Amino acid sequence: MKDGRSSILLVAIAVVGIAAPFLLPTVVTQLAFLWLMILFAVTWDVNGGQMGYNSFGNVLFFGIGVYACALVQRDSGLGYYAALFVGTGAGALCAAIAAIVLGPPLLGIRGHYFAIATLGLSIAAADIASAWEYIGAASGIALPVYPGPITGRARFFYFLLFALAAVTWLTVRALYRTRLG
């Protein structure tokens, strides 16, 4: 696509993305999940599309990040937004550390073996998480209550996921335009 048309399309997506929760207030939660799925699709494209690795391990790193974020929110004593911000950073850091530790041995495996290894790790992580009492085991983690009205919660998370999807897409797009991409 030419840069002019590409820019117009990006602006249109941004305008629709910003206006959507106000125009369609009854489906804001579903739209937030749409941005989450777009975020997953963009990140999976790096592994599965560009690198050719059919990975089932993305959920493992996502889970590590989410649990780390939830633990910071639960245990830090910070306010809601500060804990969410710090927790998101901690979650990203924990997921990155797990990727650095698990990446080299896994990336040495090719084809079906890689897919099976990442699937096995994801299943093992789910079993560990469901038995580990500190992180809530099978019951999960009770998080702090959103400090505003319940109607604002869905909109807040919509814009948070919209921003994360946009930043992730822009980062991957910039990466693809380098020599590495």
Task: For each feature predicted by the language model, list its residue ranges.
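Transmembrane alpha-helices and adjacent helix-loop boundaries
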Residues: 1-181
